[in-house]
């Protein structure tokens, strides 16, 4: 049995920098994550970045990463730091 059959979920955390606050970025991240069936959260950080944490199948996390790089229309993503993260259970994807 493959590892993916035993443990289908992983967790990732992204720190997104650029013009990502006040432009609907967290709403965009939430819509994308819900569309992909992921759980977690998106929140603004004091330093101007947005933190996105998501749990789900690796293929869906990769899809979300691509969407986060594009961002919503008014955003200007200048860089993303991606990290593997410990899995924390959430029942939905929320904006904090």
UniProtKB/Swiss-Prot annotation:
Q: Where is the active site?
A: 26, 44
Residue span(s) of domain Acylphosphatase-like: 11-96
User: Does the keyword section mention Hydrolase?
Assistant: yes
Instruction: Alphabetically list the UniProt keywords.
Output: Hydrolase
Q: Which Pfam families match?
A: Acylphosphatase
Query: What family classification does the UniProt entry report for this protein?
Result: Belongs to the acylphosphatase family.
This entry's Enzyme Commission designation comes to: 3.6.1.7
The species this protein was found in: Solibacter usitatus (strain Ellin6076)
Task: Report what the protein is called.
Answer: Acylphosphatase
Entries under InterPro entries matching the protein: Acylphosphatase, Acylphosphatase-like_dom, Acylphosphatase-like_dom_sf, Acylphosphatase_CS
Recall the GO molecular function terms of this protein's record.
acylphosphatase activity
């Amino acid at each position: 049995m493959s590892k993916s059959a035993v443990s289908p979920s992983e967790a990732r955390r992204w720190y997104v920098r650029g013009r990502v606050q006040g432009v609907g970025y967290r709403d965009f991240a939430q819509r994308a994550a819900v569309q992909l069936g992921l759980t977690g959260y998106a929140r603004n950080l004091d330093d101007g970045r947005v933190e996105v944490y998501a749990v789900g199948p690796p293929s869906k996390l990769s899809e979300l990463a691509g969407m986060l790089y594009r961002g919503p229309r008014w955003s200007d993503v200048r860089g993303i730091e991606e990290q593997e993260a410990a899995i924390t259970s959430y029942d939905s994807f929320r904006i904090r």
